[in-house]
Every structure is written in structure tokens, then in C-alpha cells.
Amino acid sequence: MSLDWLTARPIAHRGLHDAQRGIIENTATAFAAAISGSYGIETDLQISADGEAMVHHDDALGRLTEGMGRLGELSAAQIKSVQFKATADRILTLGELLDLVAGRATLLLELKSHFTGDGRLLARVADVLSAYRGPTALMSFDPKLIELARSRYPALIRGIVAQRHYSRSEWKELPASARRNMGLLLHVPRSRPQFIAYSVRDLPAGPPLLMHALWKLPLLTWTVRSDKDRKRAARWADQVIFEDWRP
């Protein structure tokens, strides 16, 4: 199966956001700007308490929004009622995002995971996507979630998000062995991703480049924020996921 569509255009990280212009990440305004610029869209999904896929990076409110609380402890209606601090946009459901994009841009959906084996978000995403016909791919840092996607929803395009090192302080829910396996991509024979999204600051790196060469897995790189990053990406990767900079 050709995934040329996945690497055809640069991908705007959390939409084409620009806080100085009042365009906040992961909002309808940022996604509309990416579509207008003919870019793909990368965005993040969290699960609400009542099982809805919500478009938001952080697992708690407060950084960009009014209000407080973890998304997993709030209903979709409660989350949608929350105001952003700097825009009239509201947090979208995945269904609302799909209605907005309507096949006009490639969608790269990062499923957030707490590495607990909870498959509710994946199940909801698969259900919502079942009636959508636009170019879409899933990805996650969690290899077990990608393995689950392969076994339960094989029609969905899936990828692994990865980097060279996973610090104990940032990834405290994971034992050292799991962090090592993720850094070296040792899970790939089981998780079987169809593409890799790898940290640009860690390129070149043996594991993703080997899999790119041997198995022809498309290699995206994140997050490109400068011409220097772009030069590195151009040498090692097939396409960029970018922000705070224009390709």
C-alpha cells in the first residue's frame, strides 16, 4: 500500500497556530489556516470521562484554557464548554474536526496514552473514522496501542512516534526496560507501524534509518522549527512536522 499521500506536504504541528496573531494550537482557526496553506495537519486526541475523543494536547486544562481539571475526569460537554484564554475557539471533538477538514488536508492524529492498556480512545477514534473518507493516519508513543490498532483495526494507517532517549523523570510511568525498547524501536516486530515519526533533534539515528532503508517505512520528523532543523530533516527524513516556522 502506497503512503505517498502521507509525505506529500509538510504537516502543521497542532495546526498552523500563531499565538501572536491569536491563533491557538489545536483550534478550528489553526486547522483552517493549515488548510488554507495547503499543509497537512497533526493534532492530539485525549479521551473524555464519557468516552469521547477530544482534540487537545495536554491531559489537563489550564495552560491555554480557563478552568482546571483532567480531561479524563470531565465529560465531553464539560470540556466543550471551556473557553480558551486567547480566542473564542472551543475544544473540538474528533467528529467536529473531521467535519471541518472534510478531506481537504491529510490528518495525522496522535493518540495520547498513559500506558495503562486503556483502549477506549482507540476504539472511539476507529468508530468516528469509520464513516470518514479523507486521508488520515494514527500515531502514538505507545507501542502497545499501535499493536492493538494493528490487531483490531487493521484498515487504519498507524505509526509510532519515537525519540532516542526517554528520561525517567518525563516517562515515570514506564520501567527502564520499556523506555529502552521504545528508544531502540525493539517493539517494531510486534507493533508493526506503517510509518515512523521521529524527533528531528535525534537524527541521524540508527533504528529509524535502518527501518526506513530495509522496510521502506516512511519517516516523518518533528518538530521542525528552523532552517537548521529543515536541513537536517531534508537529509534524513521524508517529510516534516513543523511549527513556529514555514516550509
Annotate each PLM feature:
Residues M1-P247:
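Phosphate-group recognition and catalysis centered on beta-loop-alpha active-site segments
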